[in-house]
C-alpha cells in the first residue's frame, strides 16, 4: 500500500518575484500493488509523466496573479483592434493614489489599457471539462485512465469514473486541448457573426444571445459543437479515436462538418485548407455570388518551420492577427494547444485550455455558466517559443469583407490567393479522398478501413475530366506497351492550351503488378 502526493505550483511570470500558489493536490492510492508489474509499467509511466511534467512547467509560467504588463512602450492588439499602452506609474504616484504593495501584487489595474482588458474578457474561452456525458472508449483506442487524469482531475471524479464508467471518457484532460482551442476559435467566430466585433460583455449579467452560443458547446451529444460531436467527426473524417490528440487538420475538418450540419449557427460556409495557407478564388467567390451577405469561415492549417516558427514569418503572423477579420489562431506547443488572440511586439497573447472545470451542464445559474467561459486571466509567449503547426481562422461577413481581406493579405508570406487549385494538386486530393476519404468499418468492426491498401498501384486515369480539346487517350504507341501494360494508366500534364486549361494526356504505363481501379464519384 502506498500514496503519492503531488503538489502543483504557479509562478509569477513577470519580474523576479517568486510567488507560488498551490493550484492542485493529487493523492494517488496504490493498494495491493504487484511489484513484479512495476518494471513493465515503467516505460508507460515515464512517457505519461513526461507529458504531465511539460504541462506543469507550462502552468508554472502563468502565475497566480494576473499577468503584468512589463512593456509600456508597444501597443497591444486583439483580433484587429489596437489599444495604446499605459505608461507605468511612478512609485510615489501609486502611494498618492492609495495603491500599496499588497494592491500592486494582487491587481492589474493601471497596468493594462482598460479597453484592452474588456476586449480580452469578452473572448469566449473553452477549457478541459470533467464529469460530462460519457464517451465510450474505442476497443483499439487509449485508456480513459492516465497519469494526466489522476494528477489533474479531482480525486473524487477519478474514483467515480473508475467505479461507474471504467471504459468511458468523462473528461478530456490530457488529450482535448486542440479541440478546446478549436472550439474557442469557432465560438469567437460565431460571437462575431451574431453580435458584431464591438460587442462587450457585462460580467454581472449574461447576454441572452451569447448564452445561446455558449450552450451549443455543452458537452453532450445533443449539442451541435460539443466535444462529443468533435470526437465523432474526428473519428469519421480523420480516424481519431476518443482520447487521441487532434492536430490542426483534424480540428478543421471537424469544424467544417459541424458547421455544415448546423446552418442555423450564423456561419453559412466553412472553407478549409488542411495543408497550406492557399485560398482559391473559385472556391470562395461562388459562395458570395449566391449570397453577398453570407458569413464564410476560412480555416487554414499551416506549418511555418520545422521545430519552431521561422523568424521570417513573425511579422506576417502579427499582420494576420491585426486584421479585423481574424478570429484567432489555434496552436501553441507540441501536444499542448493554445488559443492566440492578439500580440504585443514579439509576444503573442493566448488563452490556455489546460484548466479543468466542471462541464457546462453542471451550472445551475446562467451567470455561473457564463463566467466559466470568460476569463480575466491570459498570458503571452514569445514567437520563438511556439510550435510552427497552427490553425488560422478568418471570418468574412459578406462580399465586402472578402474584398477588403484580399487587400489586407496581398503581401502576406503565409496566406496566398490563387484563381484555382492546380490540376496536379486536385489529382493529389482526389486520390487521397479515394484512398482515405471513404472510411468504413473493417470486417472485425473495430475501426475505419480503406478499400485500397497502401502497397497497391492506383489507376488514376478515371479521375481526369476529359474533353475533346484538352484530353486524349494514348492507347498504344508500340507493341511492347500494348502487351505489357495491363490497362494501367498515368496522367501526363502538358502545356497550357489556348482556352486556359492544361493539356492532359492519359497513357498506359508498365508496372510490376496489376493496378486496382479507383473510380471517381
Swiss-Prot record:
Known EC number: 3.4.22.-
Entry's localization field: Cytoplasm; Nucleus; Preautophagosomal structure
Entry keyword Protease: yes
Main location: cytoplasm
Alphabetical list of InterPro entries matching this protein: Papain-like_cys_pep_sf, Peptidase_C54, Peptidase_C54_cat
Keywords annotated in UniProt: Autophagy, Cytoplasm, Hydrolase, Nucleus, Protease, Protein transport, Thiol protease, Transport
Family, as annotated: Belongs to the peptidase C54 family.
Primary role: Cysteine protease that plays a key role in cytoplasm to vacuole transport (Cvt) and autophagy by mediating both proteolytic activation and delipidation of ATG8. Required for selective autophagic degradation of the nucleus (nucleophagy) as well as for mitophagy which contributes to regulate mitochondrial quantity and quality by eliminating the mitochondria to a basal level to fulfill cellular energy requirements and preventing excess ROS production. The protease activity is required for proteolytic activation of ATG8: cleaves the C-terminal amino acid of ATG8 to reveal a C-terminal glycine.
PANTHER family for this protein: CYSTEINE PROTEASE, CYSTEINE PROTEASE ATG4
Name recorded for this polypeptide: Probable cysteine protease ATG4
Lineage of the species this protein comes from: Eukaryota, Fungi, Dikarya, Ascomycota, Saccharomycotina
Amino acid at each position: 500500500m502506498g500514496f503519492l502526493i503531488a503538489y502543483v505550483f504557479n509562478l509569477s511570470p513577470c519580474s523576479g518575484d517568486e510567488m507560488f500558489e498551490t493550484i492542485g493536490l493529487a493523492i494517488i492510492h496504490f493498494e495491493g500493488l504487484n511489484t513484479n508489474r512495476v518494471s513493465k509499467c515503467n516505460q508507460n509511466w515515464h512517457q505519461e509523466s513526461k507529458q504531465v511534467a511539460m504541462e506543469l512547467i507550462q502552468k508554472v509560467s502563468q502565475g497566480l496573479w494576473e499577468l503584468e504588463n512589463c512593456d509600456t512602450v508597444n501597443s497591444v492588439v486583439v483580433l484587429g483592434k489596437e489599444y495604446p499602452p499605459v505608461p507605468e506609474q511612478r512609485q510615489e504616484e501609486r502611494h498618492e493614489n492609495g495603491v500599496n504593495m499588497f494592491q500592486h501584487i494582487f491587481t492589474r489595474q493601471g497596468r493594462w489599457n482598460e479597453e484592452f482588458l474588456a476586449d480580452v474578457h469578452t473572448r469566449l474561452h473553452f477549457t478541459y471539462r470533467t464529469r460530462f456525458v460519457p464517451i465510450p472508449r474505442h476497443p483499439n483506442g487509449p485508456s480513459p485512465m492516465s497519469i494526466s487524469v489522476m494528477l489533474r482531475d479531482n480525486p473524487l471524479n477519478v474514483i467515480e469514473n473508475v467505479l461507474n464508467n471504467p471504459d468511458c471518457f468523462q473528461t478530456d484532460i490530457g488529450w482535448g486541448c486542440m479541440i478546446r482551442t478549436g472550439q474557442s476559435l469557432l465560438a469567437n467566430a460565431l460571437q462575431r457573426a451574431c453580435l458584431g466585433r464591438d460587442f462587450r460583455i457585462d460580467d454581472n449579467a449574461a447576454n441572452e444571445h451569447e448564452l445561446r452560443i455558449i450552450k451549443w458547446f455543452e458537452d453532450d451529444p445533443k449539442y451541435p459543437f460539443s466535444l462529443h460531436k468533435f470526437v465523432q467527426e474526428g473519428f469519421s473524417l480523420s480516424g481519431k479515436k476518443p482520447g487521441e490528440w487532434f492536430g490542426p487538420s483534424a480540428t478543421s475538418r471537424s469544424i467544417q462538418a459541424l458547421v455544415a450540419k448546423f446552418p442555423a449557427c450564423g456561419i453559412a460556409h466553412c472553407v478549409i485548407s488542411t495543408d497550406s495557407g492557399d485560398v482559391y478564388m473559385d472556391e470562395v467567390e461562388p459562395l458570395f455570388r449566391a449570397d453577398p451577405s453570407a458569413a464564410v469561415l476560412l480555416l487554414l492549417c499551416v506549418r511555418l518551420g520545422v521545430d519552431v516558427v521561422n523568424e521570417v514569418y513573425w511579422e506576417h503572423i502579427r499582420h494576420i492577427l491585426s486584421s479585423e477579420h481574424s478570429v484567432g489562431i489555434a496552436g501553441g506547443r507540441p501536444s499542448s494547444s493554445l488559443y492566440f488572440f492578439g500580440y504585443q511586439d514579439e509576444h503573442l497573447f493566448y488563452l490556455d485550455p489546460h484548466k479543468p472545470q466542471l462541464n457546462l451542464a453542471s451550472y445551475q445559474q446562467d451567470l455561473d455558466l457564463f463566467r466559466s467561459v470568460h476569463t480575466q486571466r491570459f498570458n503571452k509567449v514569445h514567437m520563438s517559443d511556439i510550435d510552427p503547426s497552427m490553425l488560422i481562422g478568418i471570418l468574412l461577413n459578406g462580399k465586402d469583407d472578402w474584398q477588403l481581406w484580399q487587400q489586407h493579405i496581398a503581401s502576406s508570406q503565409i496566406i496566398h490567393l490563387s484563381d484555382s487549385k492546380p490540376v496536379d494538386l486536385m489529382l493529389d486530393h482526389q486520390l487521397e479522398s479515394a484512398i482515405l476519404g471513404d472510411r468504413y468499418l473493417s470486417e472485425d468492426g473495430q475501426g475505419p478501413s480503406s478499400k485500397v491498401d497502401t502497397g497497391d498501384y492506383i489507376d488514376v486515369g478515371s479521375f481526369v475530366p476529359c474533353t475533346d480539346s484538352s484530353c486524349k487517350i494514348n492507347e498504344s504507341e508500340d507493341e511492347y506497351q500494348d502487351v505489357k501494360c495491363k490497362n494501367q494508366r498515368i496522367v501526363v500534364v502538358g502545356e497550357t492550351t489556348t482556352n486556359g486549361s492544361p493539356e492532359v494526356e492519359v497513357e498506359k504505363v508498365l508496372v510490376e503488378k496489376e493496378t486496382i481501379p479507383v473510380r471517381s464519384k
